[in-house]
Amino acid sequence: MSNQQALVIFSGGQDSTTCLIQAIQTYGRENVQAITFQYGQRHAVELERARWIAQDLGIKQTVLDLSLMRQITHNALMDDTAAIETAENGVPNTFVDGRNALFLLYAAIYAKGQGIRHIIAGVCETDFSGYPDCRDVFVKSMNVTLNLAMDYDFQIHTPLMYLTKAQTWALADEMGALDYIREQTHTCYNGIVGGGCRECPSCILRERGLAEYLESKKAV
């Protein structure tokens, strides 16, 4: 697929870094770009990690400012004074209404301008945190909407959609990137790189998946 280009929605976290490395191996480094969004997230370290990884992997990164979201919605992911909690409906208060819809929209606008048709997102509904915009049905509906809105044949890829966190770690290992992702990526809601705080929902999910994968690997 070296004659095609891909745009990866990139946060510097485990999932999007896994997708970025896979895209490099699939499309070729020279055919891959990353797009990152500054939307008022709790910790600047997320943007710093994304910038560092993109540079380290030799990938062109574009950062877009979507901080206006703070004017119209409030949640714990954009307020570092708020405690992270899960509502009765099972959705954590770190869920940002409309975030992935906006990410896909702006990624598509950018991609079309660059002549890119393949958009890659690291969303997953198997081990997801209860976020409705991580579901496959949402991504497929956005793909149709964007194609109609821009009269352009986008193909949104979600390679992690049906993988558990353990399987995502296995994929990283298959690509020779397990240690890189383990040590360099940022997933923690409390702003701790690598191993994280081990207490927030994101860290718990990440560490549980890693432990499960390493245990299964040991048993082989």
UniProtKB/Swiss-Prot annotation:
Domain of life, source organism: Bacteria
Pathway terms, separated by semicolons: Purine metabolism; 7-cyano-7-deazaguanine biosynthesis
Pfam families: QueC (PF06508)
Catalytic activity as recorded in UniProt: 7-carboxy-7-deazaguanine + NH4(+) + ATP = 7-cyano-7-deazaguanine + ADP + phosphate + H2O + H(+)
Broadest EC class assigned to this enzyme: ligase
Gene Ontology biological process: queuosine biosynthetic process
Cofactors required: Zn(2+)
Any one Gene Ontology molecular-function term assigned to this protein's record: ATP binding
Binding sites annotated in the UniProt record for ATP: F10, S11, G12, G13, Q14, D15, S16, T17, T18, C19, L20
Keyword list, A-Z: ATP-binding, Ligase, Metal-binding, Nucleotide-binding, Queuosine biosynthesis, Zinc
Cofactor annotation remark: Binds 1 zinc ion per subunit.
Sites where the protein binds Zn(2+): C188, C197, C200, C203
Enzyme nomenclature, EC number: 6.3.4.20
Stored InterPro entries: QueC, Rossmann-like_a/b/a_fold
Protein role: Catalyzes the ATP-dependent conversion of 7-carboxy-7-deazaguanine (CDG) to 7-cyano-7-deazaguanine (preQ(0)).
Xref: HAMAP family: QueC (MF_01633)
Entry's family note: Belongs to the QueC family.
Protein name (database record): 7-cyano-7-deazaguanine synthase
Primary gene name: queC
